[in-house]
Amino acid sequence: MTTLDSTPTSPLENPPAHFLGEPFFAETLILLRSVRDHDFDTLAGLCDDDFGIVDVDPAGNARPIRDRAGWEAWFHELFATLAAMGAETDSTIDDYQAVVDGGLGYSVLYFTQTLTLGEHVASFETVATIIWKRTPDGWREARWHASVISSDVPAELAEATS
């Protein structure tokens, strides 16, 4: 596997301590770690995504997905593409805010996503709004919408991801 696989060097293994008690932060870490580790089963178990998602592809473009079948196809394709490229991804949490009210809540996650291919590293300053719903099995992501605010992509990576 070409992922970081929970190595201590990942910023997700030592997140900012002041976010640890915030609503949905533990779940958010699981989401980000699952993407980093290409762990489809864990990711799928935490996401209902009733209304689809808007995600970011390896080139930094918006990727709207409208239903669960599309969601599953997207992540299978994404993880296979990253593995075939020999690429690693990771995330650094820059800011996090959340509100919970009864059976619903939302969080706003500012993070820097990195895509590493060999010696080249692309970074994407990203904001995600996540809608959470309470289920009998705990909190689940009901909607994810990510937008790239800015990016720094070396020319070599831009060619590889286009």
Where are these regions (language model features)?
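A solvent-exposed, acidic/Ser-Thr-rich amphipathic alpha-helical stretch
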Residues: 19-21, 40-103
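Short beta-strand segments enriched in hydrophobic/aromatic residues
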Residues: 47-48, 111-113, 145-148
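Glycine-rich beta-strand-turn "strand-cap" elements at beta-sheet edges
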Residues: 3-6, 92-101, 146-147, 161
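Short, low-complexity N-terminal intrinsically disordered segments enriched in polar/charged residues
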Residues: 1-50, 157-162
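A short local loop/turn or secondary-structure capping micro-motif enriched for an aromatic residue
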Residues: 62, 114-117, 149-153
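Short beta-strand edge/turn micro-motifs at domain boundaries
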Residues: 2-5, 125-156
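Exposed beta-sheet edge and beta->alpha loop/turn motif
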Residues: 101-136, 156-162
